[in-house]
Each structure stands twice: as C-alpha cells, then as structure tokens.
A protein has these predicted regions:
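Extended, helix-rich architectural segments
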Residues: 1-149, 153-156
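Generic detector of well-ordered alpha-helical segments enriched in charged/polar residues
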Residues: 3, 20, 32, 47-50, ...
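Alpha-helix initiation/capping motif
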Residues: 46, 76, 176-177, 230-233, ...
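Extended, regular secondary-structure scaffolds
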Residues: 92-248
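Glycine-centered flexibility motif
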Residues: 108, 134, 295, 308, ...
C-alpha cells in the first residue's frame, strides 16, 4: 500500500483516486466534474523535494576502491572494468546515483538483487548486474540480527495453457546465502512422470512438484558461495510504525500535507473555474414557440424549443438581449435587476490559493526541518539561515550514509561474484557535518587561501 501511494504522489498515476466526494454538499455528477477539472501539482512538489537529495551523489565525498597485497593494481583495474557494465552501458556508481534515489522515492521497501548469468569461469569473470524487486514481488524474507537470511521473490509470466483462464504462470526465486533456487510453474502436459501432491519428484535437471493442481519445476543455480544473500533493501529511513522492520520514503513526513494539497488544489481548480465562468442569474422571457405553455405542448409532450423550461434561452454571454426603448424615461428597466453574474468571493479564492502555497512550503519545511525553501528566508537573520542550512544537511547526511552503505554492498557483491574480493578495500566516506557550501562561501574560501599564501 505504501508503494502504491508513493507511486501516485511521484508519478501522478492514479492521483484522482485520492480525491474524495464531499457527500453533504457535492453530488456524484459534480464530483466527477471536479475530478475532470483538477490539475494535480503534488507531483511537482515531490519532485522538488527529491531533487534536493541529488546533492548527495554530487557532494565532495571520498571514494576508496583499492586492493591490498600482490597484483593489487591489476585486480582493482579488473574490478573497475567489471563495474563499468553493471548497469548495461553505465557503471555501478551511476546506478546508485540514479536508480537508488528514484526507487527510494517510489518503493523503499523493494530490494535490489545482484545477479550474474552463467559464464565460463576458465575464460572470463562473472558480469554482475542489478535485478530490481518491487515490494509486491518480495513475498517473504527474514532477518536475524539485522542480517538478511533469505528472500523469496514471486513474479508472473505468460503461460498460455487451457487449465489457466488468465494464461499467467507463477515463478518463485529463493535467494539464500550461498545459492539461489528457482521454482517455475510449467505446463502439466509436458510432464510424463507420475506426481504426488506436495512431494518433490527428482529428475536429471531438477525436481517436479505438484501443488494445488499446479505443476512446478525446481532448479538450483550454481552456488555462488558469497556467504550472504545477494540482496539489499532499497530504503534507508526506517519506519517507526513497524518498529524499524520496513522503510519509508525520504519525503514520508510530508505525506499528510501532500494529501491535503491534493484535496485543496482540487477545490481551488473548481473555484477558479467558477470565477472565470460565474453563475448567471437572470429573468427570462416566456418561450414563444407555437403551442408551448410553460414548457409543455397541448398533446402533453415537451417543447422542443425551450426543452421544457418555458423560457427562451441565451446560449452564451456574447448573445445580446434586446429591449424596446420606452417613450417615457420612467419606464426604463434597470438592467442590473434582469441579469447578474455571481462567482465565489475573491476572498475565498485568495484563501485557497494561499493555503495551497502554505502546504507546498510546509512539505519542504517538514522534510528538511528548515524554512530555507520558502520566501521567509529572505528576511531571516544570518544565524537563522545557517541553522536552517545545518538542518538540511543533517537530513542529507542520513541519505549519504544510506548511499554509501548501498554502494559498498553492490561493490562487494560484484567483487565476490567476479572473484576479485581478496584484499579489497571499498567504501565511500562523507564528512560527518556534511557541509555543502554555496558559491559565495567557496569564493570566500579561495580568497582566504590566496591571502594565506602571501
């Protein structure tokens, strides 16, 4: 559920489903019309928040990747070469800098499994790559003392057989500390061996299993003997609701305000539409169609001209209503009493607009514990601005620790699979205060350095 909500807030896909009808004052038709008119801004807000976290991979951290002992330079160069194709044509560093933050925004409870395809270990090294597992696909996993013991992943694939109405088969991958097992549903017609319910039947290449009238085939991959499950959860911020057993997105503290903004922004859109296209109140002349009497015809039918209203209608505000000029000025009609346009009070529009703006600023302030992203910083004191910036950097430092931990895990798994982990020293080092200086501060530092040289 959390992943579904995060995806809506980040991508906008399904955001309309978050809108709720105000039953006491809004009919079903009026609600549908409001949904059509709503242009969501919450995706812009979440992107604006997440963009700040991209300062982490752009910060000045220390990247240590080296081997100690014999042939150290050659082994490091080979590991860098293996890492260069970790993400297709992009390297491992680029994967963490890009996808890790993207997945934290939409599905922090997903996993990334480091895998490799079969290879000839006499002639080449393994080429590890990331396999992304959504939180929906991670159907079972277990931790002991914060160490992942196993991960079970369920995926679906096309299985066009008569016994399955949906033509979809299930595949289960069980990632263990030294090997991986795969249980895939197959067509029962391809099995010639007698099977017994819930009992494995060994064959030359694997084992058959009959379960709930479904037939599966179990295979074991070549043991990787890494000594740990080659999977790591995406998230780095632990969820207090689950006592730290699951994770939340970096902007999770702003979710209540984001949901409020979905509602308020929708109401503002309908209010603005009513302001631009106000309600028209007017006295209408009687329908002049032959046989029309208060919208009804003599034979009992509805008048086709006035559609049963009994009045002549005006199709748009550009139409003109003509009145004969009276001879006596006292007989002139006050036109303001015949036609008037009524829209929402401008105070209501301004209130809603300010409310949306305040919610947007509040989202950023809550995530970073700072007012640095609002107009209020303009009139703030220098000390206050420094404190605000420190709060932002504290938030980013938590992200930096998760970033470094994730990078290190991927590098070590890649080195293990490529048989290049002996003597490896790999880590990212961020400054504990995580100071990100602005341009003016950097210029001041350079000027101070020049003065010290004189």
């Amino acid at each position: 559920e959390l992943a579904d909500l995060y995806r809506k807030l980040v991508t906008g896909d399904g955001l309309d489903n978050l809108l709720r009808q105000f039953v006491q004052r809004e009919s079903a038709d009026a609600f549908k019309e409001r949904v059509k008119l709503t242009q969501h801004v919450v995706t812009t807000v979440t992107k604006n928040i997440m963009d700040v976290f991209y300062k982490v991979p752009r910060s000045n951290y220390q990247r240590i990747l080296e081997h100690l002992g014999d042939n150290s330079e050659r082994m490091t160069a080979e590991l860098e070469a293996v890492m260069s194709t970790f993400w297709g044509v992009r390297n491992l560093d680029e994967y963490v800098q890009t996808r890790w933050l993207e997945m934290n925004a939409t599905d922090p409870n997903g996993f990334v499994v480091v895998e490799f395809k079969p290879f000839d270990n006499q002639r080449e090294r393994a080429k590890p790559y990331p396999y992304e597992v959504t939180s929906h696909e991670a159907v079972d996993y277990k931790y002991e003392n914060n160490v992942l013991q196993y991960l079970t992943v369920k995926t679906s694939f096309s299985l066009p057989i008569n016994q399955k109405k949906d033509k979809v088969g299930d595949n289960y991958a069980l990632y263990l500390q030294n090997e991986t097992l795969n249980l895939q549903e197959i067509d029962p017609a391809t099995v010639t061996t007698s099977l017994i319910e819930n009992q494995f039947v060994p064959t030359e290449n694997g084992q058959y299993l009959l379960s709930n009238k479904r037939v599966y085939f179990l295979t074991e991959s070549i043991p990787h003997n890494a000594g740990r499950v080659p999977a790591k959860p995406v998230g780095y911020l632990r969820d207090a609701w689950t006592n730290g057993q699951t994770f939340v997105s970096p902007y999770d503290s702003a979710v209540p305000l984001l949901l409020k903004s979905v509602k308020v922004n929708s109401e503002l859109d309908i209010t603005m539409s009513q302001q631009v296209f106000p309600h028209r109140l007017q006295y209408m002349p009687v329908c002049k169609a032959d046989g029309c009497h208060k919208g009804r015809l003599a034979e009992g039918g509805i008048c086709g001209s006035c559609k049963g209203t009994g009045h002549d209608s005006i199709t748009s505000a550009m139409d003109i209503i003509y009145f004969t000029m009276p001879r006596d000025a006292a007989d002139i009609i006050d036109l303001e009493k015949i036609l008037v346009f009524k829209g929402p009070p401008i105070e209501v529009v301004q209130f809603q607009k300010d409310y949306v703006t305040d919610l947007t600023a509040g989202c950023k302030a809550v995530v970073f514990n700072s007012e640095s992203f609002s107009k209020m910083q303009i009139s703030g004191t220098a000390t206050g601005e420094l404190l605000d910036r420190d709060n932002v950097q504290d938030t980013l430092y938590s992200c930096a620790k998760g970033f470094a931990d994730t990078w290190g895990f991927y590098v070590w798994m890649t080195a293990d699979f490529a048989d290049l982990s002996k003597g490896l020293n790999a880590k990212l080092v961020f400054s504990k205060d995580f100071q990100l200086k602005n341009m003016s501060e950097l210029i001041s530092d350079l000027e101070a350095a020049k003065r010290s040289e004189v």
